[in-house]
Amino acid sequence: MKIIAVIPARYASTRFPAKLMQDLGGKTVILRTYEAAVSTKLFDDVFVVTDSDLIFDEIVSNGGKAIMSIKEHESGSDRIAEAVANLDVDIVVNVQGDEPFTEAGPLEQVLSVFKNDPDKKIDLASLMREITNEDEINNPNNVKVVVDQSQFALYFSRSVIPYPREKDAGVRYFQHIGIYAFRKQALLDFYSLPMKSLEASEKLEQLRYLEFGKRIKMVETTHVGIGIDTAEDLERARAMLRDI
């Protein structure tokens, strides 16, 4: 089974423009993310796929592998699908470009779904972690997910789901961790589907998959991703790097 990681890297980030090219301890954010993915030794290959000459040159000039894509993509997974269409690969892992502290543990967890699925009944897997802090639960930047008894996703939302009308119902809240692992054909199928109202409303690409009746297997983790969405996040990442 050939497994690759692909890191979608769009230059014009809405909340923090050019964040992937920001300096983080002497290297750019995107280069650190690429090197972190390579260092896990879980993948047969690692690529950055980007619409930016700057990002492409940053990766290639430092010995990495990059693929240019068109600019007009609805999501990172769409960008990845374009890049891997002609690659000989079985599993494609979407690693977020703004996670320079990517570790092997959570990636191994999501890949375990496919290694324990000999009949190939699961096409897409992702991660979630339990959250209990009210601020985290109510933060629209923390995407919540609810699952069925078999740990397949029922819905993702920036809103609080489920709504806590009954405070003593014993509900657990889960934050979606944005690492996806696709079988290649499932990724190409995703790419062929048009955006519908749920994805457009929430701006969550995974809702496209659910809206067309597909299933996403969720794996619970304790991993806390260190994503860089704001200038404040970047400063925290710099402080964290100094402490390593």
Swiss-Prot record:
Enzyme category, top tier: transferase
Cellular localization per UniProt: Cytoplasm
Annotated InterPro entries: Cytidylyl_trans, KdsB, Nucleotide-diphossugar_trans
Entry-linked CDD domains: CMP-KDO-Synthetase
Pathway per the UniProt entry: Nucleotide-sugar biosynthesis; CMP-3-deoxy-D-manno-octulosonate biosynthesis; CMP-3-deoxy-D-manno-octulosonate from 3-deoxy-D-manno-octulosonate and CTP: step 1/1; Bacterial outer membrane biogenesis; lipopolysaccharide biosynthesis
Example GO biological process: lipopolysaccharide biosynthetic process
UniProt-recorded Gene Ontology molecular function terms: 3-deoxy-manno-octulosonate cytidylyltransferase activity
Alphabetical keyword list: Cytoplasm, Lipopolysaccharide biosynthesis, Nucleotidyltransferase, Transferase
The keyword Nucleotidyltransferase belongs to this UniProt entry's keyword annotation: yes
GO CC list: cytosol
Reaction catalysed by this enzyme: 3-deoxy-alpha-D-manno-oct-2-ulosonate + CTP = CMP-3-deoxy-beta-D-manno-octulosonate + diphosphate
Family named by the database record: Belongs to the KdsB family.
Role of this protein: Activates KDO (a required 8-carbon sugar) for incorporation into bacterial lipopolysaccharide in Gram-negative bacteria.
Name the record gives this protein: 3-deoxy-manno-octulosonate cytidylyltransferase
Protein source organism: Flavobacterium johnsoniae (strain ATCC 17061 / DSM 2064 / JCM 8514 / BCRC 14874 / CCUG 350202 / NBRC 14942 / NCIMB 11054 / UW101)
Gene name for this UniProt entry: kdsB
